[in-house]
Each structure stands twice: as C-alpha cells, then as structure tokens.
C-alpha cells in the first residue's frame, strides 16, 4: 500500500483551501573562480526538503523521511560549491544543449554540417555527450524565487556555444508541492534552427545510504520497447521489444536480478545504460517509472511529457569520487532516471525530431513524486 507522508495528508484534509505549505529561501553558496557569487535555494514543505543551486541548475539534495520517520538525502553530490565545480559525473545537473549521446559528435541541420566536441568514448568509440566539454551543467545560471514559490533559473546559450547553432534562451523551474512532488520544467526558445534535448541528471539511492548499491531497488518502467545500441552506446535506429529480455521492467522487478544475464545490451553498457521508449499517456505528463527501496519504504514515481527514459545504473562509478560527508561513491551506488528525447535523434530520421526552430518553444516536464510503502 502506497501512502503519502501522513502530516501532509492531515494538513490537506483539515484545510483544503489553505495556501501551499512550501517555503523557499536563498543564501550565498560560494564564489566562482572569477569571483561571481553563487546562490543556493532551499524548498521545503515540512516533510520534503530540496536544495538547488545556480551552478549547473543542479539539484544539490533531496531529503525525505523513511518508514520510521528518519529523513535522509537520497542523491549523490558534494557538500560545497568547490566540490560541484569538479562534477564530472553530472550529479544532479541540468544537462544540455543536447543531453545523452550524438554519434561521432556530428550532425547536419537544414543542409549544414556541425561538429561537436567528442567528450565520451564508450567502447573506445568517441561521441558527444551531455552538451559538450562545457555544457549547461558547468555554467552559472541566473536564479530567482518566483511568486509561485518556485526557483527559476535562466541561461542564454550563445550561438555557436559548444558547436551548436542559434542563441538558445533556457528557463528551468524547480517547484515543490504539498503532495511531495518535485517538479522540474524546462522551456527554451531559439533565434535560429538548432537541436535540443535538455535532461535532469540526478543520481538516486532511495535507501539514503550512499555506501549501498541500488541493485536491491525495485523498478517499474512504463515501456514495452527499448533502443538497442552499438558498441559505442549509440542507438542502432531499431526499437526492440522488452518482452522476454532483461530489459523488461513492465512489472516491478529487482534491478540486480538479471544484471548477470547473457544479453548483449547489458554487456555493451556494463549493465543498464539504455533508453526505453515510453508508452504515451493522456495529459501534459504521463507515468514513466516507479522506483522503490524495500528497506526504507521510500517510493519515487516519475512523470514526464518526453518520449523516452534513460536508466543509467551507475555502472561507471568507481569508488574514487569523494562525495557528501566524505562518502566514496562506488559502482551502482545510485542510478539516474533521465526523461528525454531519443539519443542521437539528430542523426536518425525515424526518431522523434529534436529540432527547435524560431517561434517554437521546447518544453520538458518532469515530476518526481515521493511516498512511502508499508
């Protein structure tokens, strides 16, 4: 049985017309190497607490109580801004202009060829990953608290930045509801044709203990198909059915149950690092995934308007990164559930288009909803 946190339920029951309980505060987090101040924002509704910083539009932390009422941070990351400046694993970050991979770091648009930095080489095969060498995760955004008790972060990516055409104006909004939903919404416009796939890249361990693996977490994905890849983790262009394979999470499944299976996709990715094609739903967002930790009782549902979700199982975490409270983040100590457009979409005409043109608005809606299960 899934139940929201009790105190919030009581508040809603007794005062259905009351204003949101969410409070938002800000303070100086530190300084960039050039001396520019960086803010950190705290959103809390009395049960859930989220922190967001202007650097990288990063979700710094997310705390919720377990079934015994003990709160813990469920995310990987760093204690200080100085730590975040070394963030090479995209912990908590807003990544773009194009999240995920682009084959060979090349694409063509309206008859013109573009070359991006190749900053990733799975299987020894170079590709462009998560926007480039200095993507959205490594720049300073301008933040403010809105009248709606949300945090809005703005960044203008110049024409030609990291090789992408067009000046792109991006607004990212983080908000926290009384229903224990953390919402992340992106809106972007351009002054010239470009490609866009902006992704939220938080690493989750619902146990609240970053020294444990997520292999005992239970995952459900609202997807009947996934994108097989080549040795460089670039989609082949096919959509394969998950039925009868270790990629089938249509029913709640322990993540580590089939990691050792003799299956090509798992061998190529060193585990799970693939995009699943989501079933379409009604409304602005639809159910994408549910993650549950049996030990703590914590559950997280994911809703989005995007066509795919990437499950990255933390396969390349190696125990060398010193994170929060001195924790060493080992292999599979957290996972990412990245709602997204299809990887390498600019080079695959049969994939949903990632092209954004002047006069259009790119929108990515993502909701993480937290609850407890007995």
What are these regions (language model features)?
Residues 4, 8-20:
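Bacterial Sec-dependent signal peptides at the C-terminal "C-region" and cleavage site
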Residues 18-374:
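An exposed, glycine/acidic-rich loop-and-rim segment of catalytic or binding clefts
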């Amino acid at each position: 049985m899934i139940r929201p946190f009790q105190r919030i339920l009581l508040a809603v029951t007794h005062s259905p017309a009351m204003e949101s309980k969410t409070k938002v505060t800000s303070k100086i987090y530190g300084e960039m190497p050039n001396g520019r101040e960086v803010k950190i924002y705290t959103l809390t509704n009395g049960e859930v607490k989220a922190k967001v910083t202007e650097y990288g539009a990063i979700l710094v932390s997310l705390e919720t109580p377990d079934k015994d009422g003990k709160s813990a941070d469920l995310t990987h990351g760093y204690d200080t801004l100085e730590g975040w400046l070394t963030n090479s694993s995209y912990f908590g970050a807003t990544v773009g202009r194009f999240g995920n991979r682009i084959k060979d770091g090349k694409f063509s648009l309206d008859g013109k060829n573009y070359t991006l930095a190749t900053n990733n080489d799975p299987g020894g095969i170079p590709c462009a990953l998560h926007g480039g060498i200095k993507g959205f995760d490594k720049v300073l955004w301008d933040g403010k608290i809105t009248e709606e008790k949300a945090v809005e972060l703005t960044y203008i990516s110049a024409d030609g930045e990291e090789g992408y055409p067009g000046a792109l104006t991006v607004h990212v909004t983080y908000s926290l509801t009384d229903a224990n939903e953390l919402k992340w919404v992106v809106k972007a416009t351009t002054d010239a044709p470009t490609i866009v796939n902006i992704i939220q890249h938080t690493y989750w361990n619902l146990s609240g203990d970053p020294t444990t693996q997520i292999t005992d977490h239970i995952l459900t994905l609202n997807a009947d198909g996934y994108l097989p890849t080549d040795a460089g983790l670039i989609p082949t262009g096919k959509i394969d059915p998950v039925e009868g394979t270790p990629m089938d999470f249509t029913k709640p499944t322990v993540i580590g149950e089939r990691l050792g299976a003799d299956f090509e996709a798992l061998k190529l990715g060193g585990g799970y690092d693939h995009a699943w094609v989501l079933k379409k739903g009604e409304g602005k967002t639809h159910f994408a995934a549910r993650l549950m930790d049996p030990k703590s009782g914590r559950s997280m549902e994911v809703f989005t308007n995007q066509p795919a979700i990437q499950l990255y199982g933390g396969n390349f975490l190696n125990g060398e990164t010193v994170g929060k409270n001195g924790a060493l983040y080992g292999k599979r100590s957290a996972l990412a559930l990245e709602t997204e457009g299809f990887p390498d979409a600019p080079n695959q005409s049969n994939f949903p288009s990632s092209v954004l043109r002047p006069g259009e608005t790119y929108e990515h809606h993502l909701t993480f909803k937290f609850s407890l299960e007995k």
